[in-house]
């Protein structure tokens, strides 16, 4: 068993037309034992910048607190919100600092820049950035998510269509992964707002 699969969980981000969406499942478990169905893995790092964390649950919480601290310091120093690409570089350097004893997490960053350009990227556990223009997947349902996203994704989707696409991709992928599931949370980020929706899924 890989330590990355100890708690389970999956995350996906998609880029649309001047918008992005990021979603994660809500399950927290220890292998096949489910503990809760209210453990979201997506966190706000700014008005239009979001972070998804999959992997070992303790490292998910540790990294969230660490990035929250660093982003707050950035706001105090710069007196502005952090941009998605800047935050991605912050994530990369933070993970690389621990390259000899890495965090057991594969983060995903999604956001909309000041010029309304959608931005998504993923990372490995030591901070190598994987930039993408369509979608990024992470977690134990990675293979299933790749198949679903390649089937249903289309470029330049409007926010409502992007929500439907990412929801269907994640719900169908997590149904085929026994340590992800129990519904999902979806954030759709546009230039002027962020919409959060909870999507019900199978509870078995």
UniProtKB/Swiss-Prot annotation:
Pfam families: Proteasome. GO terms for biological process: proteasome-mediated ubiquitin-dependent protein catabolic process. It is found in: Cytoplasm; Nucleus. PROSITE patterns: PROTEASOME_BETA_1, PROTEASOME_BETA_2. InterPro entries: Ntn_hydrolases_N, Proteasome_beta_3, Proteasome_bsu_CS, Proteasome_sua/b, Proteasome_suB-type. Gene3D superfamilies: Glutamine Phosphoribosylpyrophosphate, subunit 1, domain 1 (3.60.20.10). GO terms for cellular component: cytosol; nucleus; proteasome core complex, beta-subunit complex. Keywords: Cytoplasm, Nucleus, Proteasome. Non-catalytic component of the proteasome, a multicatalytic proteinase complex which is characterized by its ability to cleave peptides with Arg, Phe, Tyr, Leu, and Glu adjacent to the leaving group at neutral or slightly basic pH. The proteasome has an ATP-dependent proteolytic activity. The 26S proteasome consists of a 20S proteasome core and two 19S regulatory subunits. The 20S proteasome core is composed of 28 subunits that are arranged in four stacked rings, resulting in a barrel-shaped structure. The two end rings are each formed by seven alpha subunits, and the two central rings are each formed by seven beta subunits. The catalytic chamber with the active sites is on the inside of the barrel. Belongs to the peptidase T1B family. This is Probable proteasome subunit beta type-3.
């Amino acid at each position: 068993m890989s330590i990355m699969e100890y708690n389970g969980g999956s995350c996906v981000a998609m880029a649309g037309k001047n918008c992005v969406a990021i979603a994660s499942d809500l399950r927290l478990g220890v292998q096949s034992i489910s503990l809760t169905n209210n453990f979201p893995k997506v966190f706000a790092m700014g008005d239009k910048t979001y972070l998804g964390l999959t992997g070992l649950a303790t490292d998910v919480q540790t990294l969230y607190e660490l990035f929250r601290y660093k982003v707050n310091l950035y706001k105090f120093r710069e007196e502005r919100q952090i941009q998605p690409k800047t935050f991605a570089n912050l994530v990369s350097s933070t993970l690389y600092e621990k390259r000899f004893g890495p965090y057991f997490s594969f983060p995903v960053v999604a956001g909309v820049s000041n010029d309304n350009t959608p931005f998504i990227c993923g990372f490995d556990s030591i901070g190598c950035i994987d930039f993408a223009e369509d979608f990024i997947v992470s977690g134990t349902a990675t293979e299933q998510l790749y198949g679903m996203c390649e089937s249903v994704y289309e470029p330049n989707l409007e926010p409502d269509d992007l929500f439907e696409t990412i929801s269907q991709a994640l719900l169908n992928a997590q149904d085929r992964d026994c340590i992800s599931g129990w519904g999902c949370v979806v954030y759709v980020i546009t230039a002027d707002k962020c919409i959060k929706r909870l999507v019900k899924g199978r509870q078995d």
